[in-house]
């Protein structure tokens, strides 16, 4: 299976969990493609089953803030199309799950239905979920994911609200 994993490349828990999961999946014979703005710090690329795709984050004079989520969405579309990925596993509701959902809609115009697994790591709900400006995006990203996991528990596909997750 060809699996895309989207995570933060930093020392935090979500990046560690995503990287270790990807390494284990590669050791089990899967082809794993990490997609992030930097190589995850625990990722060893000396495996013929592990690939890294960097999300280019360019500064544009028009934007006060770099639109990382849009760059990530475009990169996800590109990697799924060119690497023929079977599934996307994203860690964190925003910007990763929301970018994956947008990519899924774009890929549908190419006749591709890519399943999305979203793993929540707590702070994306407890911290970001408290900010009402993020709530509709978080709920949408979670609800549009095919599978939602949280601390190694799989949640059935149903409508989630930030308060219930």
Residue ranges and their predicted role:
Residues 40, 95-96, 154-156:
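Alpha-helix capping/helix-boundary segments
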Residues 1-4:
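Extreme N-terminal starter segment of soluble prokaryotic enzymes
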Residues 7-11, 23-68:
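N-terminal strand-loop element at the rim of the active site
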Residues 107-117, 123-144, 149:
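Nucleotide-sugar donor phosphate/pyrophosphate-binding loop at the beta->alpha transition
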Residues 62-87, 97-98, 102, 132-136, ...:
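An amphipathic, basic-hydrophobic alpha-helix
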Residues 156-165:
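Helix-loop-beta element that forms the nucleotide-linked donor phosphate-binding surface
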Residues 13-24, 133:
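Conserved alpha-helical elements of sugar-nucleotide-dependent glycosyltransferases
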